[in-house]
Curated annotation (Swiss-Prot):
GO terms for cellular component: GATOR1 complex; vacuolar membrane. It comes from Kluyveromyces lactis (strain ATCC 8585 / CBS 2359 / DSM 70799 / NBRC 1267 / NRRL Y-1140 / WM37) (Yeast). GO terms for biological process: intracellular signal transduction; negative regulation of TORC1 signaling; positive regulation of autophagy. Residues 9-31, 71-119, 717-752, 1258-1294 are annotated as: Disordered. Pfam families: DEP, DEPDC5_CTD, IML1. Residues 728-741 have a biased composition (Low complexity). Keywords: Membrane, Vacuole. The lineage of its organism: Eukaryota, Fungi, Dikarya, Ascomycota, Saccharomycotina. GO terms for molecular function: GTPase activator activity. Residues 1163-1238 form the DEP domain. Residues 83-113, 717-727, 1281-1290 have a biased composition (Polar residues). This is Vacuolar membrane-associated protein IML1. Belongs to the IML1 family.
């Protein structure tokens, strides 16, 4: 163990050092233990290992004696006696000897306890076994043993494996594992071995060769169950439902540090921490009480930097406060990220509040907010990968220089601006408003998730010290909101820790009474960039104002004379001098009614240096004015110091000696007492004493610095439940504090919201594992030892004064009577919210977990002990219940009631619920049923124990109790009576925001305060999970996860252009290759559809060879639809439901060409020939290759696969049945046009019929009705329904009788886990376009509810790799249209662009013939000329006069886009055309964050191909739009093409001639 490296086992009772190895011999007690040697003491000497029989081991008075027999000469036992002390072995022997000796001591003690139990003695002995290794292909068990070699062992027992080494510097390992016997194959392969370890990671960790000696010993599970295990996830989105299954899977198993654990072989996590009793160990056993915490190495981090007046202040070293952020704080965090290898995505926002009033904020009373303020938020960095950290730092510096100028300059007119307003102090800043803005990112759990990042974490950086004035109503609203969200909040203070409790919020209630409280949902840290830790409080003084007013040392040298300080020769340091000075300053005065302390307590205080110093600094006296003879604590005036500015806060020291209430005293007498004690205050802002001869100089200095300030006597204000309330607390370094001299006496404080004792001895000890103190030091204590967080003295003496009052808000905040008094251990344990308490290991100081919050933030734990008492549960909650039964149709997918119950819990965890465990839950369950003992409450279920168990889940004010009886699941919802009037009556909060590319600040589109998580209809969600989708009345209310993808053209691989098919070399164009790629992706979607068990067993497997057809077109969409108008009018004709023909109707390859040609044209299921337009060419009476392949499979009994159909089709083509329209290709399966040769054409008549198979599934246009639904669109997914199929005719706007509904997309239920490796049915709904223009975007939309996100990500990755082979790119884009993004995410950057030329008004381009057909002709041309492709059409496009005869919808719903939306071919940015003709651009952060992987340590060149420079594209486009000459050239080019009739005005696209890579 390195020198000084200790683990603090108890935070608040002191910094008791604990050795890292608790099994060290120093822990052996001095009791005499003696044992005879046994055969198991086999020590490996220099040459061989011999069994000994004459050895005895004796431990007496910390002396270890080893008797060596004659047979042991020359062995490892030779040598002097080893002396034991509490510091360890003084004369160290080999590690093997130490460990074996320890085992001997422990086992000897067990033998002494029970000599008669020989079998138990044998079972607890270490056995030496020979090690082997096995591969994963034989067994996935980490450790396997030959049970016969371990007497008394059985499968499922817990065992310990130890390694011993004699080489210096090597470390022994202690690995725990569950006993698993050799299987038959392993026993045959490892005949001479007794234990085998899985090769690979564990083998590398143990670092042992084969046939090494290891020692195995059985252990008790209950004694070795660990408290907490930390799992780290990276580069994937792991939701809380999968975290729950992780916990279930790890139950009753063992893990070791660095172990990679997996869920369904695709979700990966790494074990990074195992804790037991405050100690981090290498390996441990997990039981039902072990907490599993998930931390993310690829999280979304949000930094909110508060821009206040203090940011421009200077530190002692001359550094500006803000520069600490960019010079030390962020670089240190980035280095931490680099060392860990994180892949975070970060956003940084400046948060400022401008006071527009003329008065100073000092005139505003404590706890009162500034009235005339405007809040501003500047998005500096928006979801940028940390690999760009150098650019991030440059941007931060530039924006900080400009922000004060931007905010304070107010434009009067175009050329005149004035400076107005000021930045207030951090105390008056907008903390709660900033927090509400950050929570807008996580209010909707069903939003479109980033599939590569887990967890959102907000970090607020401030120049203050943790003290804020807040609005009372806003505080209640904010805390209520945070109770239902999964976001964590950290506050980093750049100043030094103050002398009061932090974080501290001040507010005034409705009676204008001042309150102090500390929120539980805000974790605070103090940044210290020096190597010296903050072990003591150092007074500071602001000198900025002194210098600016000319009050320098030169001017005051004649007025100020400093009395020479007489240094005590006995003082060896400044700290000692200060201690001596304080001891002399505070003398103990004895009055006629002096208090007598308990002798034992006094001795305890004097026993330590810390307590002795505290004792000397405290004064116990009797106040002269107290007629009731009540003892008080009085601070004596230092002999050479007068009060400066105002009386200082006097720290409450001996709280149990404080006086009882003075409410019975007259107010005038009480005020007089405070006026008297005010002169005895100590000024804390200086270390120098002013001379007695110059006592008036102080007033001179003050009058110059603060001319309006008069030194007043301290005035106290009485409160209902306390004699004295602090009247002022400022967070600035020069501020002084003030408090009265009397305190309310309360010897035994109890939390008022707890009516019974909550802390037994064990729990009280556990509560010490957390601390409100920062990573450096808390300011609560003036003097403390370096290794102490809270001394025992301060815990005992401060306990009575800081008891919570009636104002305590449960798990939200705790009111503090006197912030200057440290809290006790009981109260401090409540300063971490119950929802997050499981994140922190017990007995581990919180300062050791601070960095992990910044580097690897934790997800909300799965369990919580927060639960109402039985009384509150009965009187404050109302009951609503519903029952759920599984739809019998789900049995076709092998679904059971257990799967339904599992999915119901899964979805609730996704929505933010937590499992409720603890005493209150048990009490409530017992109160419900007198016959139960509460043992049936659980959170881990499996197929054996899920019936008749109670599962409690809670979020905010909603509690669900779920119980499964037989085949029915009963859900009881308990809703707490919540007063929502406060939120409704709260004034609208409208801040100003400026995103990354904006030029001016604008009003925010949403109200952050009133944006909160909505309540869900759980009855509806549960019914959907059960498979009753048809009962849903409003599909829009269904909750699901969604993501949207577009397929864009990309660079085509060189070897793709030529291929050999049927022995013929085919050369394809770029367009044909990309169309073939789309067909392959659609084929992949179709083949992966979910099938019932009956369908899987269907022998007619060639049904799967029939692929859905996607109709490609060029030109105008409605022209394409109009060409099929005749077919639409006759779409009601009866057709055969089955896609297969009867045996009598089938053909074979032996059929002659005449018969085949007739069946093709005139058969019952013929291919209708249609006229097809492709670009500017029109082909008469043709069909496509895909149609013929499907037709051959359907109609030929000896054609079973698509490959067979292509080969046979080529034969027919060679025989002259048909030919390619341009004679460029042979017969190909895809979008290739073919015509029958004239000799086989029996009727030269064009039939307007789509060439597709005759089934309801393949019709292009169909009416939506309950009797005519596509099989592919049916909601056979048990977890989600297809929205379009649930829309009845009443829900959809009914068209006129002659109108026809046109469906432009298909919906398929995709099976994400065909091999059934998952623990649940993994499905999603895939919507894809069935009508597509190759010059536009092809769309794929996914919807799911209970699918594992990693499987969704894997599916997308497979599609992406497939697309790249054909010159395509799969790009994720927002589900919502672009104009709605600022309403959802206020941090998202965008830019509004106004054209330098308005083509509608400019005479050079104003042409009514163009605008009559296409108003945005020039805008579309500009976008497509710049590389943008059409994504979505505006809804008005589908509501034009040309669409009166039909209604267009999609399988995912009706198109509701307000504007036409385009996306750049790189996928990095998107654009919209507004009605005004302006452009709205925004970066596509979903695609950028998905592609930009890597950490800070990676080389920049390795990320060039993944990084999409959206900023460069957007800035270049804006430059073009705002440059008159550049824009004019593009518009002239567009006009010229129009004159030459080379464009289609209705739906123009120039992308076909646009070179992507020039």
């Amino acid at each position: 163990m390195p020198p000084g490296e200790l683990i603090f086992s108890n935070l608040r009772s002191g910094s008791r050092p604990v050795p890292r190895d608790r099994d060290a011999l120093s822990s052996v007690q001095s009791d005499a233990i003696s044992t005879k040697s046994s055969a198991r003491y086999n020590f490996q000497g220099t040459g061989s290992s011999d069994a000994t029989s004459g050895t005895n081991v004796t431990i007496r008075n910390n002396t270890l004696s080893i008797g060596v027999s004659s047979q042991m000469q020359g062995s490892a036992f030779n040598g002097p006696r080893m002396q034991l002390s509490t510091n360890g072995l003084k004369n160290t022997q080999s590690k093997a000897l130490q460990a074996q000796s320890q085992d001997g001591c422990q086992d000897s003690k067990n033998i002494a306890d029970n000599d008669s139990d020989a079998e138990a003695r044998t079972a607890k002995r270490s056995l030496e076994l020979e090690l082997a290794f096995h591969e994963a292909r034989f067994s996935n068990e980490q450790v396997m043993v030959d049970i016969s070699s371990i007497k008394g062992a059985k499968e499922g027992d817990l065992a310990e494996l130890k390694t011993y080494r004699t080489s210096p510097g090597s470390k022994d390992k202690k690995l725990y594992f569950i006993v698993k016997d050799f299987d038959t194959e392993t026993r045959r392969r490892l005949k001479s071995f007794q234990i085998s370890v899985l090769s690979g990671q564990l083998q590398q960790v143990l670092d042992l060769p084969i046939r090494s000696k290891v020692w195995v010993k059985l252990k008790e599970k209950k004694q070795l169950a660990v408290d907490l295990v930390e799992l780290h996830v990276k580069d994937s989105y792991v939701n809380r439902g999968d975290m729950w299954k992780f916990s279930t899977q790890l139950h009753d198993s063992c893990v070791f540090l660095g172990q990679r654990v997996g869920l369904i072989e695709t979700v990966r996590a790494t074990v990074k921490g195992i804790y037991i009793n405050g100690k981090k160990i290498f390996s441990g056993y997990i039981d039902e009480n072990t907490k599993i915490v998930f931390r993310s190495e690829s999280a979304k981090l949000l930094f909110m930097i508060q821009i206040t007046d203090e940011m421009w202040h200077f530190e002692e070293n001359g550094e500006e406060t803000f520069h600490k952020v960019v010079n030390s704080l962020f670089p240190k965090i980035f280095r931490k990220w680099k060392n860990i290898g994180t892949h975070h995505s970060i956003s940084i926002m400046f948060c400022a509040s401008i006071d527009r009033s003329d008065s100073s904020f000092n005139d505003v009373t404590s706890g009162e907010r500034l009235k005339n303020t405007d809040d501003y938020y500047r998005a500096v960095v928006d979801q940028v990968n940390i690999v760009h950290w150098v650019e991030i730092m440059k941007t931060l510096r530039k924006e900080f220089i400009r922000i004060a100028q931007d905010l304070r300059n107010v434009k009067l007119n175009e050329n005149v601006s004035v400076i107005k307003g000021s930045l207030p102090s951090v105390i008056k800043s907008n903390l709660l408003e900033t927090i509400n803005l950050a929570t807008t990112l996580v209010t909707d759990p069903f939003k479109q998730n980033d599939l590569r990042h887990t967890t959102t974490h907000a970090i607020i950086v401030t120049a203050g010290s943790g003290l804020y004035d807040v609005d009372y109503d806003l505080l209640k609203i904010t805390t209520q909101k945070l109770m239902s969200l999964e976001i964590t909040m950290d506050l980093i203070c750049l100043s030094r820790p103050p002398l009061h409790i932090v974080p501290l919020l001040r507010y005034r209630d409705y009676k204008d009474q001042l309150h102090y409280c500390t929120p539980t949902w805000l974790s605070i840290s103090f940044w210290n960039d020096s190597s010296r830790a903050n072990v003591e409080w150092r007074p500071r003084c602001k000198i900025y104002n002194v210098l600016m007013m000319g009050l320098t040392e030169t001017e005051l040298k004649e007025e100020i004379a400093l009395q020479s300080i007489k240094i005590n020769d006995k003082c060896n340091s400044v700290s000692d001098f200060m201690e001596s000075y304080d001891s002399a300053a505070f003398e103990v005065q004895s009055g006629p009614y002096s208090m007598h302390m308990d002798a034992a307590l006094a001795a305890e205080f004097r026993s330590s240096k810390e307590s002795k110093n505290d004792w000397n600094r405290r004064t116990v006296s009797k106040s002269k004015g107290n007629t009731n003879h009540i003892d008080t604590i009085t601070w004596m005036k230092p002999k050479s110091t007068n009060a400066v500015l105002q009386p200082a806060f006097k720290e409450k020291v001996f709280a149990q000696l404080s006086s009882s209430p003075n409410s019975n005293l007259p107010r005038t007498e009480f005020e007089y007492k405070n006026q008297m004690t005010a002169t005895n205050s100590l000024a804390l802002n200086t270390l120098k004493r002013l001379s007695h001869a110059n006592s008036g100089v102080t007033q001179k200095i003050i009058s110059k610095l603060f001319p309006d300030l008069a030194i007043k006597k301290s005035q106290s204000s009485l409160r209902q439940k306390a004699n004295i309330q602090p009247t002022d607390l400022t967070g600035s370094s020069s501020s002084l504090s003030d408090t009265g001299s009397q305190y309310k006496r309360s010897p035994n404080p109890k939390l008022l919201h707890k009516q019974k004792q909550l802390f037994d001895d064990n729990k009280k000890e556990a509560s010490c594992g957390t601390s409100i103190l920062s990573s450096q030091s808390s300011g609560n204590q003036r003097v403390q030892d370096k290794n102490f967080l809270l001394s025992e003295t301060s815990l005992k003496t401060s306990k009575p004064n800081n008891k919570p009052k009636n104002g305590i808000k449960g798990d939200s905040w705790i009111e503090i009577e006197n912030p200057s008094v440290p809290v006790d251990a009981e109260l401090a344990s409540y300063l971490i919210p119950n929802r997050w308490k499981d994140v922190f290991p017990k007995y581990v100081a919180k300062k050791y977990t601070k960095w992990r919050s910044f580097t690897t933030p934790a997800e909300l734990p799965l369990t919580t002990s927060m639960f109402p008492t039985p009384f509150d549960f009965e009187h404050q909650f109302s009951l609503r219940n519903h029952t759920v039964s599984l739809n019998i149709e789900q049995e076709g997918y092998q679904q059971s009631v257990f799967d339904l119950l599992q999915n119901m819990i899964y979805v609730r965890l996704l929505a933010g619920f937590q499992f409720c465990l603890g005493k209150n839950v048990t009490r409530v369950e017992k109160a419900r049923d007198k016959d139960t003992d509460g043992s049936r409450i659980t959170h881990l279920i499996n197929k054996e124990n899920y019936r008749d168990v109670s599962i409690y889940l809670r979020i905010d004010n909603e509690i669900h109790r779920i119980v499964c009886f037989d085949e029915t699941i009963d859900v009881q919802k308990y809703i707490k009576h919540d007063d929502s009037k406060l939120l409704q009556s709260f004034a609208k909060y409208t801040p100003y925001v400026k995103t990354r590319y904006e030029v001016e600040y604008r009003e925010l589109d949403l109200d952050p305060v009133k944006t909160r998580r909505e309540s869900y209809n759980w009855n509806q969600i549960d019914q959907v999970l059960a498979g009753f989708n048809d009962t849903i009345m409003d599909p829009a209310t269904q909750k699901r996860f969604r993501c949207k993808f577009v397929i864009l053209p990309a660079e085509i691989p060189p070897n793709t252009f030529q291929s050999t098919i049927n022995g013929r070399k085919e050369t394809l164009t770029a367009e044909e290759i990309r169309l073939e790629g789309l067909r392959k992706i659609i084929s992949s979607i179709s083949r992966s559809r979910l099938r019932t068990e009956h369908e899987k067993k269907d022998k007619r497997s060639h049904k799967e060879e029939i692929l859905p057809e996607v109709l490609f077109y060029t030109g105008y969409l409605f022209d394409f639809i109009e060409e099929h108008n005749d077919f639409l009018k006759n779409s009601g004709a009866a057709v055969k439901n089955s896609i297969f023909m009867e045996d009598a109707e089938t053909l074979s390859k032996d059929a002659d060409l005449t018969k085949i040609a007739y069946e093709l044209q005139h058969g019952v299921y013929q291919i209708k020939l249609v006229n097809r337009k492709w670009h500017w060419k029109r082909h008469e009476n043709c069909f496509i290759g895909l149609e013929l392949v499907n037709w051959l499979i359907e109609h030929f009994s000896d054609v079973h696969t698509r490959e067979d159909a292509v080969v046979y089709g080529q034969e027919l083509m060679n025989k002259g049945l048909f030919h390619h329209v341009e004679s460029r290709h042979g017969f190909l399966d895809g979008h290739y046009f073919y015509q029958l040769n004239p000799e086989f054409t029996t009727e030269n008549k064009t039939l307007y019929k789509t060439s597709t198979k005759h089934s309801n599934e393949s019709h292009l246009m169909r009416k939506i009705s309950t009797s005519n639904k596509s099989e592919s669109a049916k909601s056979i997914d048990p977890t989600i329904s297809v929205e379009s199929n649930q829309q009845s005719e009443d829900q959809i706007t009914k068209p006129e009788e002659h109108s026809i509904t046109v469906l432009l997309s298909n919906a398929v239920t995709v099976d994400l886990d065909p091999s059934r490796k998952s623990y649940k049915l993994e499905t999603c709904i895939a919507h894809y376009d069935r009508v597509h223009n190759p010059d536009h975007c092809f769309h794929i939309r996914l919807e799911w509810l209970t699918a594992t996100p990693k499987l969704i990500d894997d599916l997308i990755s497979n599609w992406s790799r497939l697309a790249e082979r054909y010159g395509l790119k799969l790009v994720e884009i927002p589900w919502d249209e672009l104009c709605n993004i600022p309403k959802i995410n206020p941090f998202h950057s965008f830019m509004n662009i106004k054209l330098a030329i308005n083509p509608w008004q400019d005479l050079e381009f104003k042409d009514e013939t163009i605008f009559r057909e296409q108003k945005f002709f020039y805008h579309i041309y500009l976008l497509e000329k710049s590389g943008f492709l059409l994504d979505n059409r505006a809804s008005k496009f589908f509501q034009s006069e040309k669409t009166n005869s039909y209604q267009i919808i999609y399988s995912w719903g009706k198109p509701m886009f307000k504007y036409a939306q385009y996306i750049h071919y790189t996928g990095s940015c998107m654009a919209e055309i507004r009605e005004s003709g302006d452009f709205f651009l925004a970066p596509n952060n979903l695609h950028i964050s998905r592609m930009n992987t890597g950490n800070i340590g990676s080389k920049a060149s390795s990320h060039l191909k993944f990084t999409s420079d959206a900023q460069k594209i957007m800035l270049n486009f804006r430059k073009t739009c705002e440059n008159y000459e550049s824009l004019r050239d593009i518009f002239l080019e567009a006009k010229e093409k129009h004159i030459d009739n080379r464009v289609d005005l209705d739906e123009y696209t120039s992308f076909q001639s646009f070179n992507l890579y020039t």
